[in-house]
Amino acid sequence: MPWTRRHLLTLEELSREEIDQIHATAAAFKRTLSRRVKKVPALRGKTIVNLFLEPSTRTRMAFDMAAKRLSADVISFDAASSSTTKGETLHDTAKNIQALGADMIVIRHAAAGSPLYLSRILDIPVINAGDGAHEHPTQGLLDTFTMKEHLGSLKGRKIVILGDILFSRVARSNIHALTKLGANVTLVGPATLVPHWFTDLGVEVSHDLRTALADAEVVMLLRIQHERQSSGHFPSLGEYTSMFGLNKTRASWLNPKAIIMHPGPINRGVEIDSDLADGDHSVILEQVNNGIAVRMAALYLCAGGQPENVAPIE
């Protein structure tokens, strides 16, 4: 089916077929990234602005690289030296970026709903690179893309997401993608960070780590989001680690072929021990690498490209 969306704002609104289309497009682009010449001319002549109003390492660099691999011109917005420090609103900033001739905006913002707002006031495509604790759609797409590379179909697979679910936009995007792809998802962590109402999203909630990890084929660790918490949700990091940190003993409860994932940044020794983060079952750096191809797919499709046209570009 043809791709018809101009914006990528949330995985909640995508169908399983659309997620599969993005993954298939990403797989085609990933093949181009293994060549000696890694660029394709898909977005030549287009200007993409990365409007990051929250700190980022992996996502910002991956969007930069993805746009350049597509031959687009890229402008990365530096909030610290911009007029936002003088009180300019997001509305005015975005309108001025469009007036300067940008063809697409990739936005990260602390306020949930910011990408949706821009999609309503601008005439150019908008991609959500993370909005508050709401969603991080390209992270959910690259995570599920990585899982499919290792497991094939995710239908019926046992996936555990462990950590700060309440404040995690990554968790929400993964929940939407995984449930649409047929996975059995269990959320694990302290009751204060994994409230029971998450079951309304079609997942299981557990506060018993051993039971949750038993035979899981994927475990995704999430860091504690101190910057989004206004009050303590557990006594200390040490207590969190003692109850829910992933170490070798607890990893032995997983399926023997399980993969270990983390969207980063990692708090080593808190949610995961270093020997596991760097071990044979870890696919954390594969996630980072896959982020380029997946974001190439998102940029290409939102710019008007079609999945079936990627192969000739190769």
UniProtKB/Swiss-Prot annotation:
<feature type="binding site">
    <location>
        <position position="223"/>
    </location>
    <ligand>
        <name>L-aspartate</name>
    </ligand>
</feature>
<dbReference type="GO" id="GO:0006520">
    <property type="term" value="P:amino acid metabolic process"/>
</dbReference>
<comment type="subunit">
    <text>Heterododecamer (2C3:3R2) of six catalytic PyrB chains organized as two trimers (C3), and six regulatory PyrI chains organized as three dimers (R2).</text>
</comment>
<comment type="similarity">
    <text>Belongs to the aspartate/ornithine carbamoyltransferase superfamily. ATCase family.</text>
</comment>
<feature type="binding site">
    <location>
        <position position="139"/>
    </location>
    <ligand>
        <name>carbamoyl phosphate</name>
    </ligand>
</feature>
<dbReference type="Pfam" id="PF02729">
    <property type="entry name" value="OTCace_N"/>
</dbReference>
<dbReference type="InterPro" id="IPR006131">
    <property type="entry name" value="Asp_carbamoyltransf_Asp/Orn-bd"/>
</dbReference>
<feature type="binding site">
    <location>
        <position position="265"/>
    </location>
    <ligand>
        <name>carbamoyl phosphate</name>
    </ligand>
</feature>
<keyword id="KW-0665">Pyrimidine biosynthesis</keyword>
<dbReference type="Pfam" id="PF00185">
    <property type="entry name" value="OTCace"/>
</dbReference>
<keyword id="KW-0808">Transferase</keyword>
<comment type="function">
    <text>Catalyzes the condensation of carbamoyl phosphate and aspartate to form carbamoyl aspartate and inorganic phosphate, the committed step in the de novo pyrimidine nucleotide biosynthesis pathway.</text>
</comment>
<protein>
    <recommendedName>
        <fullName>Aspartate carbamoyltransferase catalytic subunit</fullName>
        <ecNumber>2.1.3.2</ecNumber>
    </recommendedName>
</protein>
<dbReference type="GO" id="GO:0044205">
    <property type="term" value="P:'de novo' UMP biosynthetic process"/>
</dbReference>
<dbReference type="GO" id="GO:0016597">
    <property type="term" value="F:amino acid binding"/>
</dbReference>
<feature type="binding site">
    <location>
        <position position="169"/>
    </location>
    <ligand>
        <name>L-aspartate</name>
    </ligand>
</feature>
<dbReference type="InterPro" id="IPR006130">
    <property type="entry name" value="Asp/Orn_carbamoylTrfase"/>
</dbReference>
<dbReference type="InterPro" id="IPR002082">
    <property type="entry name" value="Asp_carbamoyltransf"/>
</dbReference>
<feature type="binding site">
    <location>
        <position position="58"/>
    </location>
    <ligand>
        <name>carbamoyl phosphate</name>
    </ligand>
</feature>
<dbReference type="GO" id="GO:0005829">
    <property type="term" value="C:cytosol"/>
</dbReference>
<feature type="binding site">
    <location>
        <position position="108"/>
    </location>
    <ligand>
        <name>carbamoyl phosphate</name>
    </ligand>
</feature>
<comment type="pathway">
    <text>Pyrimidine metabolism; UMP biosynthesis via de novo pathway; (S)-dihydroorotate from bicarbonate: step 2/3.</text>
</comment>
<feature type="binding site">
    <location>
        <position position="86"/>
    </location>
    <ligand>
        <name>L-aspartate</name>
    </ligand>
</feature>
<dbReference type="InterPro" id="IPR006132">
    <property type="entry name" value="Asp/Orn_carbamoyltranf_P-bd"/>
</dbReference>
<feature type="binding site">
    <location>
        <position position="59"/>
    </location>
    <ligand>
        <name>carbamoyl phosphate</name>
    </ligand>
</feature>
<dbReference type="GO" id="GO:0006207">
    <property type="term" value="P:'de novo' pyrimidine nucleobase biosynthetic process"/>
</dbReference>
<dbReference type="GO" id="GO:0004070">
    <property type="term" value="F:aspartate carbamoyltransferase activity"/>
</dbReference>
<feature type="binding site">
    <location>
        <position position="136"/>
    </location>
    <ligand>
        <name>carbamoyl phosphate</name>
    </ligand>
</feature>
<feature type="binding site">
    <location>
        <position position="264"/>
    </location>
    <ligand>
        <name>carbamoyl phosphate</name>
    </ligand>
</feature>
<dbReference type="InterPro" id="IPR036901">
    <property type="entry name" value="Asp/Orn_carbamoylTrfase_sf"/>
</dbReference>
